[in-house]
Each structure stands twice: as structure tokens, then as C-alpha cells.
């Protein structure tokens, strides 16, 4: 088309040419919208880059975090108990359930009740997958499963730990060394 025919068409209002211009207008508007979207995305990304990236991650995850009741991450507690009767043993079990380490000093108890108390607390410790350790004479450590107990002390030497070679009277071996008399009294040797 020539320039004159185009001018006539514009002045006369030819529909054919108007459609062409409309398409061109829409294309230019789409291009402008794409540029505006790019500018908005650029502003949003700058806002995210200026903020702390850990805050962004924490905001998404904080809604899914649920605390466990009875468990504190701050510090561990140790409960030292010197019970005088078996009636005080449920307190030790409750402390273990609260994830506290319990040290029982049973020197003040009757030996039969002390044995019963150790059995009771050891059963409770086993039920919660805990650990138990004998620390000293009538002193015991009971710990929940969240506490690791390591012992660097060698095993105590006691009469039950000593093994002696027992020979049967029908044995063919001849033993020329006498058996040690560790458990015998010196007075009984002279009489």
C-alpha cells in the first residue's frame, strides 16, 4: 500500500487497517507488561537478598515444629537422693521420667530394703531404656536414655571376682602346690 492509500484508510476508518493497529498495540502492551513484571520480580528479589536468609527458612519451618513435653534442651539435672525407706523410691522413678540422672545413696537404709530399692529403680530404669551403674558401696547411678554413662574405673577385686582352679578328686593331674587359704582365719590354722 502506498502512503496516500493508508492516509485515506485512516481518515475514512477502514476496518482492515484498524485490526492491524490493534494487534500491534496489544503486542506492545504485552511487552510492556513483561518489563513491568521483570521490574517487580527484581524488587522482590532485592528485598529477599537484603533480609536474613535464615529468617526466611525459619518462617517456613516454624509452623511444623512441635516441642516434646517434659524434655528441656537447656541443661541436664542430677538428683542426689539419700532415702531412709522404700516409700521414697517413686520420687526416683519420677525424676528418671523427667529425664534427670539419679544418684542413690542407700547407706542410711536397711540392707534388705536397700536391695529392694535398687531392684525397683533398676526396673524403672530398664523400662525407659536407661543406664545403671554402681558407683560405690551402697551408691548407685541411674540415668535416662538421653544420658551416656561411661565408666573408666577398673573392676573392683572382690572374693566373687577371684577364680581359683578347682580340681576334682578323680582328676589324673597331680597338683604339688597347696590351695591358698585366703578366706580362712589365721586362728583356725593353729588349732
Curated annotation (Swiss-Prot):
Which purpose does this protein serve, as stated in its record? Cell division protein that is part of the divisome complex and is recruited early to the Z-ring. Probably stimulates Z-ring formation, perhaps through the cross-linking of FtsZ protofilaments. Its function overlaps with FtsA.
Question: Where in the cell does this protein reside?
Answer: Cytoplasm
Chain intervals for the UniProt region annotation (Disordered): 153-191
HAMAP family from the UniProt entry: SepF (MF_01197)
Entry keyword set: Cell cycle, Cell division, Cytoplasm, Septation
What is one GO cellular-component annotation here?
cytoplasm
Please provide the Gene Ontology terms (biological process) for this protein.
division septum assembly; FtsZ-dependent cytokinesis
Among Gene3D superfamilies, the record links this protein to: SepF-like protein (3.30.110.150)
Q: What is the name listed in the Swiss-Prot or TrEMBL entry for this protein?
A: Cell division protein SepF
Please report a single Pfam family linked to this protein: SepF
Q: Provide ranges: composition bias, Polar residues.
A: 153-178
Similarity comment text for this entry: Belongs to the SepF family.
Q: How does it assemble?
A: Homodimer. Interacts with FtsZ.
Amino acid at each position: 500500500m502506498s502512503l496516500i492509500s493508508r492516509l485515506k484508510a485512516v481518515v475514512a476508518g477502514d476496518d482492515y487497517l484498524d485490526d492491524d493497529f490493534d494487534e500491534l498495540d496489544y503486542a506492545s502492551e504485552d511487552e510492556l507488561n513483561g518489563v513491568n513484571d521483570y521490574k517487580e520480580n527484581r524488587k522482590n528479589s532485592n528485598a529477599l537478598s537484603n533480609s536474613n536468609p535464615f529468617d526466611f527458612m525459619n518462617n517456613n519451618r516454624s509452623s511444623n515444629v512441635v516441642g516434646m513435653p517434659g524434655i528441656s534442651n537447656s541443661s541436664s539435672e542430677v538428683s542426689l537422693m539419700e532415702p531412709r525407706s522404700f516409700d521414697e523410691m517413686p520420687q526416683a522413678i519420677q525424676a528418671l521420667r523427667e529425664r534427670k540422672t539419679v544418684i542413690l545413696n542407700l547407706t542410711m537404709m536397711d540392707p534388705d530394703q536397700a536391695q529392694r530399692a535398687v531392684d525397683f529403680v533398676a526396673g524403672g530404669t530398664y523400662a525407659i531404656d536407661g543406664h545403671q551403674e554402681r558407683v560405690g558401696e551402697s551408691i548407685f547411678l541411674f540415668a535416662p536414655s538421653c544420658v551416656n554413662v561411661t565408666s573408666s574405673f577398673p573392676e573392683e577385686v572382690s572374693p566373687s571376682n577371684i577364680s581359683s582352679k578347682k580340681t576334682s578328686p578323680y582328676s589324673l593331674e597331680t597338683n604339688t602346690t597347696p590351695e591358698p587359704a585366703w578366706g580362712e582365719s589365721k586362728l583356725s590354722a593353729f588349732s
